[in-house]
């Protein structure tokens, strides 16, 4: 359903954000 899509996109965005933070911290 629509909420499943929203949840999936939200999780993907969250993972990408955490990844970006980790990269920034590592540099």
Curated annotation (Swiss-Prot):
Q: In which tissues is it expressed?
A: Expressed by the skin glands.
Q: Provide this UniProt record's keywords sorted from A to Z.
A: Amphibian defense peptide, Antimicrobial, Secreted
Specify the superkingdom. Answer: Eukaryota
Q: Which InterPro entries match?
A: Dermaseptin_dom
User: Single Gene Ontology BP term?
Assistant: defense response
Gene Ontology cellular-component annotations: extracellular region
Give one Pfam family, short name only: DD_K
Any signal peptide, and if so, which residues?
none
Name the predominant localization: secreted
Q: Where in the cell is it found?
A: Secreted
Q: What does this protein do?
A: Has antimicrobial activity.
Protein family according to the UniProt entry: Belongs to the frog skin active peptide (FSAP) family. Cruzioseptin subfamily.
Q: What is this protein called?
A: Cruzioseptin-14
Source taxonomy lineage? Eukaryota, Metazoa, Chordata, Craniata, Vertebrata
């Amino acid at each position: 359903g629509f909420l499943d899509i929203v949840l999936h996109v939200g999780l993907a965005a969250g993972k990408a954000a955490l990844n970006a933070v980790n990269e920034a911290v590592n540099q």
